[in-house]
Amino acid sequence: MLAVLLISGIAHGMAQEVLTLEKALEIAFQNSPSLIQSKISLERSQMNLKAQEASLKSQFSLSVNPFNYSRQNSYDDYNSQWYINQNMSSSASLGITQPIKWTDGTVSLVNDFSWQDASNKTSGKTNTTFRHNLSLRLNQPIFTYNQTKMQLKELEYALENAQLSYALKQLNIEKSVTDQFYSVYQRQKDLSIAKDEYQNQKQNYDIIKNKVEAGLVAKEELYQAEVNLASSESSVYSQEISYENVKDNFKLLLGISLDEDIAVIPNTDIVPVEVNPIEAVKHALDQRMELRQQEITLEQDQFSIIRAKATNEFKGSISANVGMNAFDSNVKNVYDKPTDNEQIGISLSIPIFDWGARKARVKSAELAHESNQISFDEEKKQIILDVRSICRNLPTLLSQI
């Protein structure tokens, strides 16, 4: 059995890649599936924010209807005869819309131009019209929250949260790789010790066997040596299995082929650094990214409360429209007698009774905020406990190294 393991180890050693901790971390950062997914999520958040910021710039639109034709037969009951109406038209509309981030309103400049030719085949009458309409329009919500600014702020928080998640994922990968790197090294040393022990037991067995054959010791000692040798061989087999299992898990974490054989070389030259527990706790509370993520969640809860309060709320909008309307049967005379158009209006939405739906939604959002606040406080306590525990264990860990 041991011979098979040794031959297998030699075969693997021919194509073995030796990894340092730095090289293992570099491979993990490049190949880790979870880190790649986190980076994709970060890029998505960046694109969402970029799209929202682009939507706040002037939007240009062009609508063209090159040609439209219709023919309709109509019956006049009074004159008891049929009329054939024929209509041809063409139109184009150019619009420029500018959102107003500070007020959540929009300003639009719309330029419409159309041509229409209508004829009655029965009477022989024809009417041709060229029309140009230029208007400036304003739409402004009132008595409600600014949805545009809130959406932009939410996307900024989402991007910051994605950046924090990516950084945390990197730290988790670094910790996991470091832990498993030294686990592989530990199993590697355990296997080496087990093989050395096997060689010692084999030599001891050969010595006792020679002594038994020479009649210098009793046969019982040979039996005990055989038991010790078999136990040592079994230990080598167990350590070999444990070593291969740990290596497979490590290769899976690094994102490399499971068929590739590896070995690790750690750096055991550790420079001790004195840690002040009080300063360590203070630094952790200031820098831990998990706490910032919790703070972002609390800010997003405030947005949820605002939206809940806006359900069935009293709100309104102001709309205004000024422009010029010009038309004529001859395109050259369209602007001879233009007319001015002005329009302004206020609309209000007044809720009367909603059976308590708005109140329940607000209460639900407030309870969610309260729950997340408790989670935030508990996270701070847990961080303090973890840092204190690590500081207490540092002398023990240093002695183990």
Protein language model features and the residues they cover:
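A glycine-/polar-enriched beta->alpha junction
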Residues: 26, 30-36, 43-59, 93-125, ...
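Periplasmic alpha-helical coiled-coil/stalk elements that build and connect Gram-negative outer-membrane
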Residues: 153-159, 163-283, 393, 397-400
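Bacterial Sec-pathway N-terminal export signals of envelope proteins
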Residues: 15-89, 150, 154-156, 264-299, ...
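Active-site lining segments that contact anionic ligands and/or coordinate catalytic metals
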Residues: 313-317, 341-343, 389-391, 398
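Bacterial Sec-dependent N-terminal signal peptides
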Residues: 1-19
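Small/polar, glycine/serine/threonine/aspartate-rich low-complexity segments that form flexible
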Residues: 64-136, 264-276, 306, 319-350
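Amphipathic alpha-helical coiled-coil segments
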Residues: 37-52, 169, 173-194, 210, ...
